[in-house]
Design a protein with these regions (language model features):
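C-terminal target-recognition/interaction regions appended to catalytic cores
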Residues: 1-186
Length: 186
């Protein structure tokens, strides 16, 4: 497969070769609507959605309840009453978005008043939960001496782990193909 022309520009780089789902397919799923916030509520994954894309899947996969960073979250000083009124899945605001357990997460980009609320707990997300939404392995933790602000800034500045892994694998394949083509005199 030829990836560059005579002028050495990329013609057909296989960006999507490691993608598991297309954005179009994800957007076409029948994701649940907003539901009233009920602290401690339990619900089953709805039929017809990719569970592996959901917030709850990543919370469970990373065992966020038992993670070293499980109890590292900002405690609400004011605004708890307002926080309790925000429905699960209301992510249309600039700040204080209550993510839905059975939807994919909005972009994890903390800072500039971007705040994600836990789907079924009366609090903001923990460091462990935010890292799980970036698809980081559950063994990953941040140094305990890091401030909460720095933890969330670090998480928000990161590229999702699985995305980075896919890009790296695609680049590796591309380089290996280019080397093989070079060695074969193509």
């Amino acid at each position: 497969q030829e990836f560059k022309g005579d002028d050495q520009t990329l013609l057909q780089f296989p960006w999507e070769s490691k993608m598991k789902c297309s954005l179009e397919d994800i957007r076409n799923e029948q994701w649940p609507d907003m539901t009233p916030f009920v602290e401690g509520s339990v619900s089953e994954c709805p039929d017809g959605i990719e569970k592996e894309l959901t917030v709850q899947y990543w919370f469970e996969k990373n065992d966020v309840e038992n993670h070293p960073d499980a109890n590292r979250y900002f405690k609400p000083k004011a605004g708890l009453r307002k926080m309790l009124e925000i429905p699960e899945g209301d992510t249309n605001k600039k700040s204080y978005k209550r993510i839905h357990r059975w939807r994919y997460s909005p972009t994890v980009a903390y800072g500039n008043n971007e705040v994600h609320l836990h789907p079924y707990k009366a609090r903001r997300l923990s460091v462990a939960e935010a890292m799980s939404l970036q698809s980081l392995p559950k063994e990953f933790s941040l140094p305990p001496e890091m401030t909460l602000t720095d933890c969330f800034k670090t998480i928000g500045n990161g590229v999702p782990f699985l995305m980075a892994k896919g890009v790296a694998a695609t680049l590796k394949d591309y380089i290996n193909t280019a080397v093989l083509n070079e060695e074969a005199g193509k």
